[in-house]
């Protein structure tokens, strides 16, 4: 009785296998069996593959299993079951190749095939879908489940096996069959294509991408704790050789089956015939995987097939190894043919190239050993005893210890047990290198070179980059782009820029033609690279940062090569054309530099990256060293060319949301702030100088930042691997040290024990007589000469054991032996801030003392002295003509008048404002919307200046010549004693007026003034002769109402000014509801006082002074205390004058003419104080 196979599959378990896994594999095996198989009954040789009755349904079921288990449950069980059943190599590949052969051979086409054409295409598409799912590249990361991590290595080997079968079966006919599915889609126009057609084309491109992405894992080393022996584990499955999956075989198969042509077709028409959003990312990744791990010069330069002398046996062994691995490498002719049908050459195969590298490494080691091997007379054994200074003895054996003292100490060091920490991690090479080294033979080089030339000349590169640029600049799509896509974009740009630059260098052309890569040099691309560089550093994405450094380095190389180009000397006919081309190239180079070095934050990132580079992989470290080298070289070129760069410094806004000025709308506040700010000429010029100083890039100051001790440590770490470096790399490090030590004369920067030991080992390693060793010897001689001088000054230099501190005092002390003293130069800005702070402190103390007094003495000069100090500009008139301030001031006045709180003041007492609270509030209000610089001192000064300007009365109220504000007048008070006397007189009169205003109210608009005048005229007519005389004397005494004859002494301009000011006063006034109340109070005072002209005049003076905008009225207010000032001035002479009202008018007219500039400033002070108190 036969055994049931299904029962055996479901009951017999393998080690570490669950029942569910066994059942799943049984289901997949049943589906694969029902799919079809080889028809052994057919007479055709080889026998064809015969599909089952429900082949399409079986393929759909397998696809459902993959998505349901592997994708949704994060497992690889279905993929392993398909590999165990041989689905790919025994079914899918054969089905696709057989269908392609039938479609290609027109003679075998029958009516049955034509009738079943649609069904066969569905089956082929289902096969393609399963192939794409099973070959989808995997990445080992934290997002994998525990089961996926356990099966990751096994599934990776299975994918490598699938790649081998796809490329080797009928010389890659599977790719040809897949492209045949895409041909009908490509033949359609863009309008006629349906979404299903685009999906078919995407499947074809994804399948191509998967083949490029599949590569074996890194060689892993497993160390056992018992014997500490390292056992390498194979990363290739059984039956797969490196040549089967190498880039050479891949390029050959792609060329033969028109895959490269398909890629060129789609990328060349990606913006016209194909949707860029659907195909640009896939095409970009395919191109990126083609060039990943390759150098541009390796594609351009044809290297010889053998660089070392290989004997016949070695070559035959290499050929045998290569031919046994694959059946396609049987032809061993030495001729090179770019035809895709020509098999790979054994001597130039992957195995042969690996053998050549091993032989080259062995030759280098033998050459280094020959320098230290003793003669044949010394090979009889050696035993040395070394006694140290502390009487300890060390024994060294071997003839290597007899060569020199260096060999003796090295032999002694090798006998020690070192526990060296691994200072670097391989966390930054994922996007720039492959898991296994790439060896490109002659045939693969020619195929790839032809593809790249077609890719550039056909405009495919520009189309692809432009489509990806629009996607990266879109905010919605940018969030969906992963890290790999961004890295592939910038790495592709860097690689093709390097390719074009190397091609120009090798061709010897005098012009720099970068038209084929113009999309990479666009302005948008520069913004993207700067943002990508900065974001990668901030997010600590070291793989992305590595790619960003490569792209940034290539851009600098292009600019530096153009700057290094000399103007060609030609005949007169060619001079004009060459000069134009030279200017075009120079403009390109300057544009690159200006766009790259346009942000101060990006410069800070460039300085910070090399300081931590030694903690990462050697490739990352080498790339950072090259970036620093090209930056320093570029700075030298810029300095020679006198190129001026300006760096933009970002201004940060205050975090607190500050209140706007008097709750005005934003537009009005912006106009007011701009107008007042632009009125200050000196401050505007100072701010302009500051912006220019901040933005202009100082090459010397920026260059110093790249000589930080952490950067020096990076160079030392890089050169410590001198055994793996070329002479060019060593020379690059020596150039940096020479610039630091010799050019900049920063001796203490290299007085380090690790550097001394490194330079000594490097000298012994380099071969004698080589040019690089001569340079090392010269540097060591100069270094030791300076070190001896330094050691005499510091007998016990402990500083050489550690890196130097970068503080200025330490650097100064180590360089000169003297203590560092701060610069005693006086900063004018500091003096201005200090004086202002002192004035504010005195002002606050005076306010605190005055707040304790209930009453205010108008004759107390000490009590009002603080207002003179708080307003040092009181003695000057700084009236400027500003536009649109009349309208803005009217809005401001309207708001203040509506929000006055008249209950805060008692009648008869004028309280001073609380300066501490008000000043804080005013500063907050006036600083709204202002930007602050990075410097805290500049921010404070700017905020104080803005607050002072916004509190200033608009200067277009007077038509006078503008007078610039001087710093000395802003800080220091006037030395003239007469100014103090006049100020005291004015503030005494002002306080008196304020008391009267508080008692009777205010006149704030023209309407109320007119009503007030009518009431007074009515009183003068109906009140009798006494009332009429009192009103006439009050008008004459106080100049309450301006008549035509009052301005006889003024010139025409003065009359026009006064008319203009009265007109603006009426425009600025707003409605006030308390007119009737004021008139009642005036009427009661007039009736009570009767014929008292003095009291009536005082009341009139109160109403007159309350008009906040008339200068003539303010001039009249000052006449109240002129007698007191004259008495103080003539006190020494003993003359006291008692004049009547007519004599006072004559004397006061003279004083008013001399004090013409006072009313505006004091009027501003009065308004500010009154509005604050009432508020």
Swiss-Prot record:
Q: Where in the cell is it found?
A: Nucleus
Record key words, sorted:
Cell cycle, DNA damage, DNA repair, DNA replication inhibitor, Meiosis, Nucleus
GO BP annotations of the record are:
DNA repair; DNA replication checkpoint signaling; meiotic cell cycle; replication fork arrest
Is DNA damage there in the keyword field?
A: yes
Q: Which GO terms describe its cellular component?
A: replication fork protection complex
Composition bias (Acidic residues) maps to: 930-940, 1044-1053, 1137-1156
One example of the protein's molecular function in GO is: DNA binding
Which stretches does UniProt call biased (Basic residues)? 910-921
Instruction: Please note every region of biased composition (Polar residues).
Output: 1078-1096
The ranges of region (Disordered) come to: 894-982, 1043-1175
Where is there biased composition of kind Basic and acidic residues? Answer: 954-966
Primary location class: nucleus
- Sequence similarity: Belongs to the timeless family.
Please explain the role this protein plays, according to its UniProt record.
Forms a fork protection complex (FPC) with CSM3 and which is required for chromosome segregation during meiosis and DNA damage repair. FPC coordinates leading and lagging strand synthesis and moves with the replication fork. FPC stabilizes replication forks in a configuration that is recognized by replication checkpoint sensors.
Subunit structure comment from the entry: Component of the fork protection complex (FPC) consisting of TOF1 and CSM3.
This protein is called: Topoisomerase 1-associated factor 1
Gene of this entry:
TOF1
């Amino acid at each position: 009785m036969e055994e049931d196979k299904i029962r055996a599959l479901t009951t017999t378990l393998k080690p570490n296998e669950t029942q569910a896994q066994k059942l799943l594999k049984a289901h997949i095996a049943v589906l694969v069996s029902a799919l079809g198989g080889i028809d052994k009954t057919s007479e055709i040789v080889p026998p064809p593959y015969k599909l089952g009755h429900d082949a399409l349904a079986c393929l759909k079921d397998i696809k459902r299993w993959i998505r349901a288990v592997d994708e949704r449950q994060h497992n690889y069980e279905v993929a392993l079951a398909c590999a165990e059943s041989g689905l790919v190599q025994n079914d899918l590949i054969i089905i696709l190749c057989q269908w392609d052969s039938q479609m290609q051979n027109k003679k075998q086409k029958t009516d049955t095939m034509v009738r079943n054409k649609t069904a066969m295409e569905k089956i082929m598409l289902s096969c393609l879908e399963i192939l794409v799912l099973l070959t989808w590249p995997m990445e080992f990361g934290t997002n994998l489940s525990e089961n996926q991590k356990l099966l990751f290595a096994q599934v990776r080997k299975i994918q490598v096996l699938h790649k081998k079968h796809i490329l080797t079966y009928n010389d890659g006919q599977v790719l040809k069959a897949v492209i045949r599915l895409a041909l009908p889609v490509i033949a359609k126009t863009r309008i006629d294509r349906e979404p299903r057609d685009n999906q078919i084309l995407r499947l074809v491109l994804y399948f191509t991408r998967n083949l490029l992405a599949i590569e074996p894992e890194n060689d892993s080393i497993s160390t056992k704790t018992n014997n500490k022996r390292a056992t390498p584990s194979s990363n290739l499955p059984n039956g797969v050789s490196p040549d089967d999956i190498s880039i050479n075989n891949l390029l050959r198969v792609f060329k033969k089956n028109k895959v490269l042509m398909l890629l060129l077709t789609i990328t060349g028409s990606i913006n016209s015939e194909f949707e860029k959003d659907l195909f640009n990312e896939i095409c970009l990744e395919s191109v990126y995987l083609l060039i990943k791990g390759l150098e541009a010069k390796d594609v351009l330069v044809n290297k010889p097939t053998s660089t070392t002398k290989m004997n016949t046996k070695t070559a035959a062994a290499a050929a045998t190894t290569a031919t046994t691995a694959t059946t396609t490498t049987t032809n061993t002719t030495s001729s090179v043919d770019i035809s895709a049908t020509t098999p790979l050459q054994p001597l130039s195969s992957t195995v042969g190239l690996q053998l050549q590298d091993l032989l080259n490494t062995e030759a280098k080691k033998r050459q280094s050993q020959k320098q230290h091997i003793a003669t044949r007379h010394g090979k009889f054994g050696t035993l040395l005893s070394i006694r140290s200074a502390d009487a300890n003895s060390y024994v060294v054996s071997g003839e290597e210890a007899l060569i020199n003292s260096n060999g003796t100490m090295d032999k002694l060091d090798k006998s020690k047990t070192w526990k060296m920490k691994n200072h670097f991690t391989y966390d930054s090479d994922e996007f720039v290198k492959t898991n296994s080294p790439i060896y490109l033979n002659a045939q693969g080089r020619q195929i790839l070179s032809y593809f790249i030339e077609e890719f550039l000349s056909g405009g495919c590169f520009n189309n692809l980059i432009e489509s990806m640029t629009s996607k990266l600049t879109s905010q919605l799509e940018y969030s969906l782009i992963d890290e790999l896509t961004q890295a592939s974009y910038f790495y592709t740009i860097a690689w093709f820029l390097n390719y074009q630059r190397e091609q120009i260098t090798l061709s010897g052309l005098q012009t720099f033609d970068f038209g084929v890569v113009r999309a990479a040099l666009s302005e948008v691309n520069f913004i993207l690279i700067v943002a990508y560089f900065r974001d990668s550093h901030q997010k600590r994405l070291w793989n992305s940062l590595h790619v960003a450094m490569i792209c940034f380095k290539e851009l600098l190389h292009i600019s530096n090569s153009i700057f290094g180009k000399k103007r060609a000397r030609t005949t007169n006919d060619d001079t004009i054309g060459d000069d134009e081309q030279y200017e075009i190239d120079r403009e390109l180079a300057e544009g690159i530099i200006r766009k790259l070095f346009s942000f101060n934050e990006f410069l800070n990132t460039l300085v910070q990256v090399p300081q931590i580079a030694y903690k990462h992989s050697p490739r990352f470290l080498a790339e950072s060293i090259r970036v620093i080298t090209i930056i320093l070289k570029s700075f030298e070129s810029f300095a020679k060319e006198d190129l001026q760069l300006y760096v933009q410094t970002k201004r940060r806004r205050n975090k607190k949301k500050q209140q706007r000025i008097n709750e005005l709308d934003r537009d009005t506040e912006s106009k007011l702030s701009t107008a007042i700010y632009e009125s200050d000429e000196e401050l505007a010029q100072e701010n302009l100088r500051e912006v220019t100083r901040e933005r202009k890039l100082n090459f010397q100051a920026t260059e110093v930042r790249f000589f930080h001790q952490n950067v020096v440590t990076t160079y030392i770490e890089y050169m410590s691997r001198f055994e793996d470096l070329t002479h060019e790399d060593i020379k690059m490090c020596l150039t940096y040290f020479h610039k630091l030590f010799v050019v900049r004369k920063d001796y203490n920067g290299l007085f380090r024990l690790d550097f001394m030991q490194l330079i000594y080992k490097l000298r012994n390693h380099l071969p004698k007589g080589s040019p690089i060793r001569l340079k090392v010897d010269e540097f060591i001689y100069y270094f030791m000469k300076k070190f001896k001088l330094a050691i005499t000054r510091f007998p016990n230099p402990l500083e050489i054991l550690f890196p130097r501190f970068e503080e200025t005092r330490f650097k100064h002390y180590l360089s000169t032996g003297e203590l560092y003293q701060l610069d005693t130069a006086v900063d004018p800005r500091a003096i201005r801030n200090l004086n202002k702070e002192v004035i504010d402190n005195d002002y606050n103390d005076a306010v605190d003392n005055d707040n304790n007094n209930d009453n205010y003495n108008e004759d107390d000069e000490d009590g009002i002295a603080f207002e003179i100090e708080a307003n040092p500009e009181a003695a000057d008139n700084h009236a400027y003509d500003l536009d649109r301030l009349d309208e803005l001031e009217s809005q401001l006045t309207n708001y203040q008048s509506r929000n006055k709180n008249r209950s805060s003041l008692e009648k008869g007492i004028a309280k001073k404002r609380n300066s501490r609270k008000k000043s804080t509030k005013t500063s907050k209000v006036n600083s709204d919307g202002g930007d602050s610089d990075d410097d805290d001192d500049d921010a404070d000064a700017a905020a104080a200046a803005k607050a002072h300007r916004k509190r200033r009365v608009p200067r277009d109220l007077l038509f006078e010549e503008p007078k610039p504000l001087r710093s000395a007048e802003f800080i220091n008070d006037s030395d003239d004693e007469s100014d103090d006397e006049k100020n005291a007189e004015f503030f005494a009169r002002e306080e008196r007026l304020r008391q009267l205003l508080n008692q009777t109210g205010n006149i704030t608009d023209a309407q109320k003034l007119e009503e007030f005048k009518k009431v007074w005229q009515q009183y003068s007519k109906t009140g009798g002769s006494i009332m009429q005389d009192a009103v006439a004397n009050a008008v004459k005494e106080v100049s309450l109402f301006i008549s035509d004859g009052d301005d006889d002494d003024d010139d025409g301009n003065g009359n026009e000014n006064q008319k203009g000011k009265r007109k603006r006063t009426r425009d600025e006034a707003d409605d006030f509801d308390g007119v009737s109340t004021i008139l009642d109070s005036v009427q009661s005072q007039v009736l009570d006082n009767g014929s008292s002209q003095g009291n009536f005049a005082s009341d009139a003076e109160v109403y007159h002074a309350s008009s906040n905008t008339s200068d003539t009225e303010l001039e009249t207010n000052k006449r109240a205390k002129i007698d007191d000032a004259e008495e103080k001035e003539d006190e020494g002479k003993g003359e006291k004058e008692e004049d009547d009202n007519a004599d006072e008018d004559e004397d006061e007219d003279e004083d008013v003419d001399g004090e013409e500039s006072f009313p505006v400033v004091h009027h501003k002070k009065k308004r500010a104080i009154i509005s604050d108190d009432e508020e």
